[in-house]
Every structure is written in structure tokens, then in C-alpha cells.
């Protein structure tokens, strides 16, 4: 496993130090399996959802979450890292998958959850693909707090008016884009800020999942001829007018509603935004899993975004945190969480309030699909930062992809050289 240097966030770390000052080493596990569990999260806006979930966890597991939410990401990260040096290590906390989680695992700061995952997989509660996201050197750490599958949303009225059915192949999807363009309708949404990676992610993984993985490990260069060919295809699509105005300030959900474009590639959490814009799930909008670019792939790759719930190895509430984590994986817990958050459940045996999301969860859990980590989590942070900027620049002013790819690769070369 590759490791990376942990960035220091000095100001936030100092703040965290004052909160946890001079507490000494880690606390001894008290062995409790019921009671109040101290839970820290960087999703402060979700506190009401976790509070709502307490009704289920109290009655089913006899555990109540005492939630402390942070809205500042840097301050939260510094707080958690500092807590590992004290006797206040959290019994349960949220984090990020990918290199950020790998750092904590490599430093032996996270409690192992292999037994929990084994039970969940054997019970049909979770896919083996998702387990890989939480696997380091053959062992599992943390459990998924939430999950989002990156799919294609579409305006049902536009599809109906144009006589379009959901595509099952990449060729059919391209034909749809051509048909829409011919009718004066922009096929796809795009933006030049932050969410600039998804079309690149989709085409690379849909061409060859191993090629995509190679970018995240440094085994494949961004200037690889196969990557260049994919970018050339993207350029052709841009020049054909398949994508929306990258500089538009219209809310993406509103844009789909009013027909600024027919489709948008987004995470399955986007249902909430569309509902908030006044669209009705299954009536005004629907979704489909994007077909693989390469028709010869045996499984259709699906990007997955998952945020972990972790237990600190030296927490005095380690056993309580692991007990809650085991319950969290169950159908009853995920049903309750779906009711509280309105999200798709990673457990295919859970009941999801939105039939569309329930169907999606069941679909991608089948053997016909292969889950892979979203580019945002799969890519080391220094490379990601440059890549998002370069993809955004390419989207804003489409042109020869090589200068953009060379800039990303220069950062990748520097990063991987430091890992030797």
C-alpha cells in the first residue's frame, strides 16, 4: 500500500489541542456494549438525521449517539488527528475513504472491522466490491456511513417528447446525444468548477477499470495514449455541442427541470435536489446506470462514493463503537437511516422510501455491475487538486488535451516520487 505525508493544519490543530489539552495517551477500552456513544462528524447539517436515528438504535441496539458536528472541514480533521494523541479518541467518527483513510490505518489508529464485514457479506447485506474500498492489506477498517452511485439522471418529459428510451449500450447513449442535438436540445450538463471529473471518470473506467485504477496508483500516466484517446473523444463531444454552458450559474436541478439540458451525471444523492426543485421522482425525472464505453466488459462499472464511519483503536469506547458499527450494517439500521436521510441504502435488503433509489441499490448489487471508487476519493489529494483545475479549464475552453494532461502528469510525477 502506498502512503503519503500527512499535511499539517497548524491553526486548526492548535484549536483542537486546546480542546483536548494534555490528556495523555489513549484511553483503555471499557468494554461496554450499550449506552451513550460519543460520535463526531464533519457533516454538521446531518445532526438532526442522526438524532432521528437514535429512536431505532436505542430500541434495537440499546445505543444512543451523542453527536457533535463540525462544519469546518480543516478544523474537524485537525481535531480528529489530535484526539488520537489523547484519552479522548472518538468511539465513532466520520472520515474519508482513499488515501486519507489509508494514512490512519497505516498508523494503527483505526479499529479493524474485518469480522463485521465478513458477517455483512455472508448475510448479503453488502457487496464484495464495496468491501474492497475499506480493505487495506487484506483487512477491513470502518464501515460505510452512506453511499452514492454516480448515474445518469434525465428529464422524462424530454425523453418522451423525443421518443427516447433508456440506453443499454454506449452506442445507444451516443445516438441519443446526437438525436437531442439535432432537435436543438443540449444532451448533457457540465460545469467548470469542482464537479469537473465525472465524464473523465466515466469514460476511463467504462473503457477499462484497470486503466482507471492505474491512474490512482501511479502505474498509468495521464499522458498514456489510451488516456489521450479518451480525452480526444471527449473533445469531439464538446465540439459537437453535447454539453451545456460550463459557466452557467443556474442550479443544476433547476436546469434539468426547465430543459436547459436533458441529462446530468451525478451521485444518487441528487434526488433530494431534484425534489427540492419541484420535480417528482419517477414522473418528472428518472435515472439509469451509464453503459460501459467498452461493450466487451463483462460487468458495467459504476462509480461509488462512500463516506466511512470509523472507530479509534485507542478509544475508551472502542467496543461500543464496534457494536454500533455492526448494527449499522443491518437491514433495520439502513432502513431507518434511509427514512431519516432519504438516501439510497448500501444494504440491498433494506427498505428505501424512494422506489427509484431502492431499485438502484438492488440493481448495482447484482453480479452484472462492478463498483469502483469515485475519482474524487480514488485520487491522491495533490494530484486531484491539479486535475480538477485542468479538467475545468478543458471544459471551459475545449482544445488539444495534451497540455492539460501533461500538467496533471507533472504533479503526479512529483507526488509519486515522494512516495518512493
How does the language model describe each region?
Residues 343-344, 361-413:
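C-terminal capping/gating helix-and-loop segments adjacent to ligand/active sites or protein-protein/ligand interfaces
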Residues 179, 217-246:
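Glycine-centered hinge/linker elements that transmit conformational signals in sensory
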Residues 228, 232, 240, 277-340:
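Extracytoplasmic/periplasmic substrate-recognition and gating elements
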Residues 82-83, 90-91, 122-157, 186-187, ...:
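A structural signal for short loop-to-beta-strand junctions that line the ligand-binding cleft
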Residues 114-126, 192, 208-229, 276-280, ...:
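Short, solvent-exposed loop/beta-turn-alpha elements that line the ligand-binding surface or hinge
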Residues 2-102, 166, 279, 290, ...:
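Conserved N-terminal structural module of periplasmic/extracytoplasmic solute-binding proteins
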Residues 98-150, 174, 282, 286-288:
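Hinge/lid segment of periplasmic solute-binding proteins
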Residues 137, 141-145, 150, 174-220, ...:
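Extracytoplasmic/periplasmic solute-binding protein
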Amino acid at each position: 500500500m502506498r502512503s503519503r505525508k500527512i499535511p499539517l493544519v497548524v491553526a486548526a490543530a492548535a484549536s483542537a489541542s486546546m480542546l483536548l489539552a494534555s490528556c495523555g495517551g489513549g484511553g483503555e477500552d471499557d468494554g461496554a456494549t450499550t449506552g451513550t456513544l460519543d460520535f463526531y462528524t464533519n457533516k454538521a447539517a446531518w445532526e438532526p438525521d442522526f438524532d432521528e436515528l437514535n429512536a431505532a438504535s436505542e430500541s434495537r441496539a440499546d445505543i444512543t449517539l451523542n453527536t457533535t458536528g463540525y462544519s469546518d472541514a480543516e478544523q474537524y480533521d485537525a481535531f480528529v488527528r489530535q484526539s488520537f494523541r489523547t484519552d479522548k479518541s472518538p468511539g465513532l467518527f466520520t472520515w474519508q475513504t482513499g488515501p486519507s483513510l489509508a494514512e490512519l490505518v497505516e498508523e494503527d489508529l483505526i479499529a479493524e472491522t474485518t469480522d463485521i464485514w465478513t458477517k455483512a457479506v455472508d448475510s448479503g447485506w453488502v457487496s464484495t466490491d464495496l468491501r474492497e474500498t475499506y480493505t487495506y492489506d487484506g483487512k477491513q477498517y470502518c464501515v460505510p456511513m452512506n453511499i452514492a452511485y454516480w448515474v445518469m439522471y434525465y428529464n422524462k418529459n424530454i425523453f418522451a417528447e423525443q421518443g427516447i428510451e433508456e440506453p443499454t449500450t454506449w452506442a445507444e447513449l451516443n445516438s441519443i446525444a446526437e438525436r437531442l442535438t439535432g432537435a436543438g436540445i443540449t444532451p448533457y450538463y457540465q460545469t467548470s468548477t469542482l464537479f469537473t471529473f465525472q465524464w473523465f471518470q466515466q469514460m476511463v473506467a467504462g473503457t477499462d477499470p484497470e486503466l482507471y485504477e492505474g491512474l490512482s496508483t501511479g502505474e498509468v500516466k495521464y499522458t498514456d495514449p489510451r488516456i489521450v484517446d479518451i480525452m480526444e473523444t471527449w473533445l469531439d463531444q464538446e465540439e459537437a455541442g453535447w454539453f451545456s454552458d460550463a459557466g452557467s450559474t443556474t442550479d443544476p436541478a433547476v436546469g434539468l427541470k426547465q430543459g436547459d439540458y436533458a441529462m446530468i451525471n451525478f451521485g444518487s444523492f441528487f434526488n433530494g435536489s431534484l425534489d427540492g426543485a419541484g420535480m417528482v421522482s419517477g414522473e418528472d425525472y428518472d435515472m439509469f446506470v451509464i453503459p460501459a464505453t467498452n461493450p466487451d466488459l463483462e460487468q458495467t462499472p459504476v462509480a461509488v462514493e462512500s463516506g466511512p464511519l470509523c472507530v479509534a483503536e485507542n478509544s475508551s469506547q472502542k467496543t461500543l463503537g464496534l457494536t454500533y458499527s455492526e448494527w449499522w450494517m443491518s437491514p433495520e439500521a439502513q432502513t431507518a437511516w434511509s427514512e431519516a436521510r432519504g438516501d439510497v441504502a448500501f444494504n440491498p435488503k433494506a427498505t428505501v422510501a424512494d422506489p427509484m433509489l431502492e431499485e438502484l441499490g438492488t440493481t448495482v448489487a447484482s453480479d452484472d455491475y462492478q463498483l469502483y471508487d469515485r475519482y474524487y476519493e480514488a485520487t491522491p489529494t495533490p494530484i486531484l487538486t491539479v486535475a480538477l483545475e485542468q479538467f475545468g479549464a478543458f471544459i471551459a475552453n475545449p482544445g488539444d488535451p495534451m497540455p492539460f494532461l501533461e500538467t496533471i502528469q507533472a504533479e503526479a510525477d512529483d507526488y509519486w516520487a515522494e512516495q518512493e
